[in-house]
């Protein structure tokens, strides 16, 4: 089933849900997946945008070179094979020849070719793609092009060697480069179609983009519904077992609604809320069918505004209070005291319940397994470096699904130091 990276992307930090699935539910239609969405897409321009609300739609419609399987392993998508030079600077991808572009109506438009990847990066660079920082200093010559040091895109290290071979030359070895190819800024786009749409490319209509993925967007109505239909011409269509996807907008105001629609057969999958009045009854009735959604690459976080100019939404009203607040925030020990003093698990439990509270937590901006450095993950390497901030940072666990920072004793010690300095 080729839906390993598609359809459900609710595992956000402080937003991981408990999901009720219709496995074995009587009269369930196995050819149609029905559920809800709560984040309204704002654009389908996958080359310029990187927000999860939008990419959760695009990932069902457009394929890149590689994708992640259900275990997070990188597997071929549009690239059927690839190689890396001995110095780690050149990545060469051989494209599958049966991948095509299709219109929203399912009509074949053109083959997917290597030049489509070159066009995609140039378009993103010319239009200040929001995820440009992911690749700007990675691809040779791209930074010079983006900053205006040169206007010659042929100096940039992305080349179509032939119709089905695309090559990237990097500024330095990046053992994790392949993982970057799953980001939409590195997805392909057909140049002829792009020019024909001009500023209409990626607007919120099905015909604003072309499709090379497992689904076609049948309909999108803002804060109402999203509908996909299986792309019958998709190169891997035999592995796509769900014919239709129907998502209804859910604003969270009526938490019992998802259960009612699940029980009526309207939803294949529904979110359940541990703090709702019906949760205990729902859990007892559907215990074997309740699962936790997985965390994904998206993180929600809050941080200090160290250069605050406005105090409109605080209790600080006098100039003295505002000055004291700013002075405290600029104190390193005060900030560390707050960091060690926030019980993130308790905070999460307010919306996710005690049972799911820790499952939502992340301790790094990106997943701790984001990249592999030798035999260690990004999280493990980062944790080993934290001791440079002081001995209190040693031994901190940056793995997902637990609070690596909360420590009452450390918070009190740091606060005491801050009081002396303030």
Where are these regions (language model features)?
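N-terminal lobe/hinge region of extracytoplasmic solute-binding protein
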Residues: 36-86
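C-terminal motif of bacterial Sec signal peptides marking the signal peptidase cleavage site
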Residues: 19-22
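Gly/Pro-rich hinge or "lid" segments in bacterial periplasmic/extracellular proteins
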Residues: 170-246, 257
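Bacterial lipoprotein signal-peptidase II cleavage site
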Residues: 24-31
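Extracytoplasmic/periplasmic ligand-capture domains
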Residues: 97-107, 111-127, 216-351, 372-422
